[in-house]
Amino acid sequence: PLLAARRLLGAELIGRGVTAAIVEVEAYGGPADGPWPDAASHSFRGAGGRNLVMFGPPGHLYTYRSHGIHVCANVVCGFDGVAGAVLLRAAVVRTGADVAGRRRGPAILPAALARGPGNLCSALGITMEDNGIDLFDADSPVRLTLGEPVPSVDGPRVGVSKAADRRWRLWLADSSEVSAYRRSPRAPAPGASD
């Protein structure tokens, strides 16, 4: 997952009239018995229900609702049958800022159009109905185009209570679109075992 996360930084996400370059991601592994055990992952307890897409082929979109409200998008990155995904946390809108602005609201500054996972999905028109689509299929409503690898900074993931110190959040250091870091109040103290 971490290799895939690095590869997704700088990639272009194209969806419903908006093109955005990905500037922040978080990697998530899979079940306890898999190659990348990750207690913070939706797939940690195994395949079932909403997380089945995470066990499917790589390059597909896994969507879920955060706190029952915000749609969040992940790129599946494990090989078929092995869970892994990369959460798309933030992007800079390159084209279609007017469309993204209508979706997000008139008071939103350009740098904030796709800052944060829920805002990114809102700006690009990604919904729960997009769960499972192939991001590399030219006919998909949301597509991904990889670019050249870019230098990144890493740090702990945002808002997770398990595996909170894992440095699987990556971002472009010079981007004003990167979201703020917030540690989960339920996470153990930094450096403590979880």
Swiss-Prot record:
A Pfam family this chain is assigned to: Pur_DNA_glyco
Which of UniProt's keywords are assigned here?
Answer: DNA damage, DNA repair, Hydrolase
Tell me if Ribosomal protein is a UniProt keyword of this record: no
Taxonomically, the superkingdom here is Bacteria
Q: Which major enzyme category is it?
A: hydrolase
Enzyme Commission numbers on file:
3.2.2.-
Q: What is a single molecular function from GO for this protein?
A: alkylbase DNA N-glycosylase activity
| GO BP annotation list | base-excision repair
Q: Please give the family membership noted in the entry.
A: Belongs to the DNA glycosylase MPG family.
Record-given protein name: Putative 3-methyladenine DNA glycosylase
Species, as recorded:
Mycolicibacterium fortuitum
